[in-house]
Amino acid sequence: MTVVYEDNHIIVVNKTASEIVQADKTGDTPLSETVKQYLKEKYQKPGNVFLGVTHRLDRPVSGLVIFAKTSKELTRLNEMFRTSEVKKTYWAVVKNAPQEPEGELVHFLVRNEKQNKSYAYDKEVPNSKKAILHYRLIGHSENYYCLLYTSPSPR
């Protein structure tokens, strides 16, 4: 685990691809538990350590995750994410070039709890949630393309 930033209120860590942020049905150790153990050892805290999960990244995604070290900070950060005061930006390396160098993708997502997966559809289907993604091609090599994308929707 790599700590990128830490103060009295938050800790920001680099999540590697394949790690989970919160516990799920797989039983794999989540990053949140690894961070709790780190804080417990670093500050020699007896008993339970508070750590609030402010957002998640999917298992196959790597990137920075912000955890709240106090319940008060968790409330503040949750409000900032809820009101889009925090702007999430993603970089993706893909093998196929996008049709346009810049654009918007709209899909409808359905979560399958039994499979622990989500599925994307081009048209609205029962129990789906609309997801919007804005992307821009920012570079490429001979075999790969780098996209910068943002999402105004929480999905």
List the model feature ranges, each with a label.
Residues 1-151:
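RNA pseudouridine synthases
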Residues 153-155:
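Positively charged, low-complexity/disordered segments
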